[in-house]
Amino acid sequence: MINEKQYYATIDEMDAVLNAITYHGSKLIYVAGASASWKSFFNKKLQEALTAKGHRVLNISSDDYYTDLTNINFMLYGTFDHPHLIDYRGLQADIDTLFEKGKVKLPQYSFKERRTVSYRHIDTFNYDYVLVEWLYTINQLWNAHNPFKIFVDSHIEELIFRRLVRDQERVSEPLHDIVSMLGKVFPLWKVYGDGQREKWDMIVFNDYNILDAKGESYTLKKVDYKKSELGTLQKREYVNEFLYDDTHPGNGVVVVSEVYRDKYGFLDGVIVSKKNRNGDPRKFTEISMRINQPWFLTVIHTLLQTAGLRYIGREKRVESTYKNGDKEVTIKERAGEMFEKVAEDMKK
C-alpha cells in the first residue's frame, strides 16, 4: 500500500530531508529501518546536518532500552533483533516525560555487561529536536507529540550482504552462524517492519551497493588454450550455480554455488556471492564467501527465499587453477567454452 502523503529521498539527499522536517514542524523525529539499512549512519548524518544549521539535538537510541530480561528473552526468541526484547513502552514513557515535564532520566545499556549500567539525566528541555533511533517496528503510541517518522529503506539482497560482511568484520562470527541468525531476523522484519511502510511520513532510500566498496572486479576472457600449455593443475572444482534475481535492475544477482572436488563425489562446500555485470557480458564485480559445511546449502537457500528473492535458474561450470612458473591461471569452463579470469589490477 502506497501512502501518497509520504516524502521520498535518497540517503544522500539531506537537504530534502531537512526541508520535509521543517515543513512538518515537529520537534520529535523517529528514525527506523531494517538491520544493516544504515539507519544509525543516517541518524548520525541527520544530527550533524541539524547541528550545522544551529539546532540543538538530543539523540535517544532504542538500544538503551534492552532490559535485564533481554538474555532470557533472547533464549525464547533466538535473536536480539526481536522487538519484544526492547522496552518500547518504557521508551515512550520517557519521551512523554521529556515533552510534558521538560526533564527525564534516560537509561544507558551496556552490551558488554548486558544490563543497564547508568542513567543520563536531562534536567532542562532546551533542544530544538529530539531524534529517536528505533529498531524497525511501529509502536501504536508513536502518534503522541506529533512525531515525524522516517524509514531508512534498501534492497533486500543488499541488506543481507551488508549484514554478512559487517558481522564477520565486527564480531568474527562464523558465516553459518550469521546466516542462521538472519534466517530468524528477516521473517520478523517482514512482519514488524516491511509491512507497515504506509505508516511512515518519509522513506529515505539507501542506494549504496556493497559491490562498489567490497567487490572484486574481473574480466572473463575467452581463450582456446591446450591443457598442456596451462602448466601444472593445482585445483579443480565442479560447480553448480543457483541464481536468484536482484530486486532492482542493475543491483546484482545473488548466486549460491555447490562446490565438488570430484565430479561424482560428495558436496565439498558452498559459496554465496553477489555479482553484477559492468555493462559488458564478460566484465563482473563480485563479492563472495565460502563455507565448507555442506548443510549450509539448505540454510542459505531458505534465507534467500524467505527474504523474497526470486529463483531464476541453474548453471554448471568447471573451475581449474593452473601454475606455470610464477604465473597462476584460473580457467572457467562452461558449455564447452573456456574463459580465463583476469583481475582488473592485472590488466595492462
Show where each model-derived region lies.
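The conserved Walker
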Residues: 35
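Hydrophobic positions on the alpha1 helix immediately C-terminal to the Walker A/P-loop
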Residues: 42, 46
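ATP-dependent NMP and nucleoside kinases share a basic, alpha-helical "lid"
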Residues: 117-167
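N-terminal strand-loop-strand beta-hairpin
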Residues: 216-324
